[in-house]
């Protein structure tokens, strides 16, 4: 089921009648969401420049740059990576060539060095646990809570909008919606509940109420029809997703304690 939902959300988005290939959404307070196919990033427009998150790909980054220039003539000063997977962080060279600095958690630099891709720009600035990119009266705060979808994924809070940007590990508005491809070899499922609970606590401390997803989620009707879900959702979705993992681990543990093998447990659950 999770494979079907992941495929439906990322690949089939292009087949939804009336769904534009790209979309630009003004979220307020200088924060914008850009969607290309089933992928989404956010960017902040400030009086001193623009902060862009995941460039998505070389082709998508060109469209993103054009969209930014319809809003402001300020240059892109920073590109922030959510993690190290190529399908999100490819394409930053167009911004690097214009002087932007790339920011990522320190393990992303190692991953990119060990598994290079010609379209992935290595980070210029790395950090361990937290880094805040500040331009004008805006900031993008990057937080690392340990390994999750890869070993360098971060969540980001855009201010003053105070919205959380989350990639791959969950898609709002429904916290129960499965993340994208949980079978990735560098997924660290053991830490997923802790990562999400730490993110939930962060939102509580910051007073944030809204989450922006790094992927387009789809509402699937009883007849199999698919309609695009909203790009934002309640912070509660983070806690719901943490609960999903906690319950799943508990079910697996209970079944294995009853004698189920790793092959039998999924069928029993």
Per-segment meaning from a language model:
Residues 1-7:
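Bacterial N-terminal signal peptides
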Residues 8-13:
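Boundary at the C-terminal end of the N-terminal hydrophobic targeting segment
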Residues 21-67, 154-168:
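Conserved beta-strand hairpin/beta-sheet module of binuclear metal-dependent hydrolase folds
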Residues 24, 47-51, 59-103:
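Active-site metal-binding motif and surrounding structural segment of the metallo-beta-lactamase
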Residues 30, 44, 54, 68, ...:
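Divalent metal-coordination and catalytic microenvironments
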Residues 49-50, 57-59, 132, 139-141, ...:
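Metallo-beta-lactamase
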Residues 86-146, 150-154, 201-210, 255:
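Divalent-metal coordination cores built from histidine and acidic residues
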Residues 257-269:
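C-terminal regulatory/interaction regions
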């Amino acid at each position: 089921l999770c494979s079907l939902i992941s495929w439906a959300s990322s690949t089939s988005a292009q087949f939804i009648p009336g769904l534009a290939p790209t979309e630009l959404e003004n979220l307020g307070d200088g924060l914008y969401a850009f969607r290309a196919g089933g992928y989404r990033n956010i960017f902040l427009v400030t009086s001193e420049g623009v902060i862009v998150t995941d460039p998505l790909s070389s082709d998508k980054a060109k469209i993103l740059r054009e969209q930014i220039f319809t809003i402001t003539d300020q240059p892109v000063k920073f590109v922030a990576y959510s993690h190290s997977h190529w399908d999100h962080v490819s394409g930053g060279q167009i911004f690097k060539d214009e002087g932007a600095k790339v920011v990522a958690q320190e393990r992303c630099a190692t991953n990119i060095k060990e598994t290079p891709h010609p379209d992935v720009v290595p980070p210029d600035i790395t950090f361990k646990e937290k880094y805040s990119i500040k331009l004008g009266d805006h900031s993008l705060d990057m937080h690392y809570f340990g390994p999750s979808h890869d070993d360098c994924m971060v969540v980001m809070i855009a201010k003053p909008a105070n919205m959380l940007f989350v990639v791959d590990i969950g898609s709002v508005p429904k916290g129960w919606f499965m993340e994208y491809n949980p079978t990735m070899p560098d997924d660290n499922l053991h830490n997923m509940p802790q990562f999400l609970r730490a993110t939930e606590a962060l939102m509580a401390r910051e007073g944030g109420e809204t989450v922006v997803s790094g992927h387009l989620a789809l509402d699937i009707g009883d007849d199999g029809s698919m309609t695009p879900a909203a790009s934002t959702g309640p912070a509660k979705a983070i806690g719901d997703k943490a609960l999903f993992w906690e319950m799943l681990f508990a079910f697996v543990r209970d079944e294995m304690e009853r004698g189920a093998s790793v092959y039998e447990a999924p069928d029993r659950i």
